[in-house]
Amino acid sequence: MISMIINKAIDLGQGKIISIETGKMAKQADGSVVVRLGDTMVLATVVSSKKTPPPNQDYFPLQVEYREKYSAAGKFPGGFFKRESRPSEKEILSARLIDRALRPLFPDGYLFETQIIVTVISSDQINDADVLGGLAASAAIMVSDIPFHNAMSEVRVGRINGKFIINPDVNELVNSDLDICIGGTTDTICMLEGEMKEISEAEMLDAIKFGHDAIRRLCALQNEIAAEVAKPARPFAPAVIPSELTDLVRGLCETRLRELAYTPLRKEDRAEQTAAIYREIIQSTVEHFKAAISPEEIQADPSKALCLNEHIIDEQIHAVEKKVMRHMILDDAKRLDGRTLEEVRPISIELGIIPRAHGSALFTRGETQALVTITLGTKKDAQSVDNLTNNADKKFMLHYNFPPFSVGETGRIGSTGRREIGHGNLAERAIKMVAPPEQEFPYTVRIVSDILESNGSSSMASVCGGTLALMDGGVPIRKPVSGIAMGLIKEGSNYAVLSDILGNEDHLGDMDFKVSGTRDGITACQMDIKIDGLDYHILESALEQARRGRLHILDKMEEAIPSARVELAQFAPRLTTIQVPVDAIGLIIGKGGETIRSITEETGAEINIEDDGTVTIACSSVEGTHAALATIKTLLAKPEVGTIYLGKVRDVRDELGAFVEFLPKTDGLVHISEISATERVAKVSDHLKIGDRIKVKLVDVRKDPRTGKTRFALSMRAVETDAANGAPQENNQENQ
């Protein structure tokens, strides 16, 4: 049977026409679509297993993969094998954007293994495919038979000269003062992530509303296509838990969990006591139903077997725990650690605690602790970025590490996880907005945040610690940046916004909203919503409460260090920049890099040369910098008659004289008659040997009429005569 091809397009304004097509490609997947903007095209497919999940599975195994094919832009992949390999950071971050927006929209209890693959099959290298991938993934699910709540769309919002733009291209983003990716349904926003140049909370809301208008239209387009495809939904019904199980569990644990919730405890102590309650309740429940339910009853009503399933009992206890904590916050405005809704945990800051780092800070907020260091380098240390829309070098980076011991666990140590990449990217974007321009501070900057303890908001601790480490290292950032994670508990029209959330509040709550910024505005944000129907007035309230929390944290940071240190750290490289003629670059580099390597080995300085003749010298010692600079200046020096040089004897001719290299790659002749002012020289080798270092004066420069080469006449006798007459010799130049 030939599939019906459906292709529909929508004009979002400003020349942004997006089309969605289904029925042509990847027809054996449960759902597939191709989304196009300009000449950028993404293919999204979704397949959900029909195999019944294991009875003890308690999570939704959703896998989202986003891949950019180099062939999409007519490029070859780098590397020896010339094919795509593991996903890049850009691909991982794009996959996370899609995953975070889609995951809450699958029905509760749907635990079938599901895989979404988004592939960029064409790239015009102008329109980024990441938000198109979110739209395509949702559309692929909508045309499938997989259970799904609502169509979801993603857009990017930029702003140029005060005017908002939907899905700005890479050229427009250069001039935009914000870059926000927004994911949402017709009724609500479910995901935010972006960076901004210190915009206000009101401007942020305006940008979200502008993006939501486009999202509604894209969702309507998906619904139109889904209605035409008209694929019947596969049967799915979540397991019905017997009421006698929920009643028994609630009766056994509700009071105990409430008492525990109202007792402020350390994370470790709370976890131990909670685990003990779980173990006791599970054991008591299983024993109760073993005695109460006969095998015949289970055979007659298989749902009664759930009463003996420890995993199901665990889920029911967790539901009671969640309800207890949420009502404690909503009814009594109390939190697990005894704080008020808006209270930020105690903050402590130590600076300069890593002696050899170029800047360091230990930032502790409650039971979350980040050890952050900075390293300053040269352009050689920049990270090479090669993707479909960006081939520039990256000179400002933040790497976030989350070892298992930070939460008191053992675990895998190896390649960086997706969560670590995502958290590091958010913190990097927050601080990048206040980094000094390259013209003023030409260093490559690497920030490393190692999370030593975690009980919520570790990415925001990385923002605060990263800012402090930069200031400790003398990096002239424009303004300090702080970050705070906000939470939400919502039941009907009743809600509470929480500042500086704990891990449990994140897990049991409805929102995780991270906001970073300066005193003057927001620089980065990330929001994930677990519920439908987030009203804009709640979002406005959360942003304002986050602003107050952000300022409180900035006060604490500025108490520790009011401004960046004036000097760089002792072991940080000092950069000196000079401009040389373009035709002199080869002279400095030397044959096969011989000369520049020699300078590096002798002085300890690292030297970078740009194509325009900009030479950057990096060295941690002043002496090394001066030595390298002097050597380069000597290399570039032009021979001047009357100048005295310290040269090296390269060749000796007994009856003629000695050839001396008085400048790099420049030899002159000291005639036998010019060797001594006090005696007659009969044999040159009696006075000079190859390798000797001698002072010579350039006395004449002329061109050989026969060969056209420039000849340099040098004199040792003139140096002796000048010294005897007391002539100044300030112009001495040494050939290194």
UniProtKB/Swiss-Prot annotation:
Mg(2+) binds at residues 506, 512. The keyword Metal-binding applies. It is an enzyme of class 2 (transferase). It comes from Chlorobium limicola (strain DSM 245 / NBRC 103803 / 6330). Disulfide bonds: none annotated. Residues 573-632 form the KH domain. Gene3D superfamilies: GHMP Kinase, N-terminal domain, K Homology domain, type 1, Nucleic acid-binding proteins. It is found in: Cytoplasm. This is Polyribonucleotide nucleotidyltransferase. The gene is pnp. Residues 642-717 form the S1 motif domain. Its EC number is 2.7.7.8. Keywords: Cytoplasm, Magnesium, Metal-binding, Nucleotidyltransferase, RNA-binding, Transferase. The keyword NADP does not apply. It catalyses: RNA(n+1) + phosphate = RNA(n) + a ribonucleoside 5'-diphosphate. Involved in mRNA degradation. Catalyzes the phosphorolysis of single-stranded polyribonucleotides processively in the 3'- to 5'-direction. GO terms for molecular function: 3'-5'-RNA exonuclease activity; magnesium ion binding; polyribonucleotide nucleotidyltransferase activity; RNA binding. Belongs to the polyribonucleotide nucleotidyltransferase family. GO terms for biological process: mRNA catabolic process; RNA processing. One of its GO terms (cellular component) is cytosol. Its main location: cytoplasm.
